[in-house]
């Protein structure tokens, strides 16, 4: 799980230690941990911060550290709360591209997001909640008209096989302070 606020999950002294924490806790050998840390530092352009305390970084960099620390564990299911919040456009696009590649490799992705552009680009299904209740669920309608309206999804259709739910989006439509 990647929290929306990176300060809720970062607790190590340096960026490098933060990224290494998960793989180390999984019992991976040092060489594998080092490789994964290096991959994440490169992916998020964090090498210049590897020996710096994440607490001293800007919000976008702390988000990148939090995201990379979870990605380094290579979990089979990844839950992301507003994954691109606070990231500049370039870093957000890079991160979402990485998420898409992980999904293509079989990682189940659950995104909680208000960013409908990301929804239409990266998700196959939407589960929309309003006041804690499901108001709609189904495959995403990728037509241009539908993308202009956040409440439009395709009606379920018959197919030759089951609909893949490897990429699900939870879209919260009403936010109450302190509750998601």
What is the meaning of each model-derived region?
Residues 89-91:
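Helix N-cap at the start of a conserved alpha-helix in ABC-type nucleotide-binding domains
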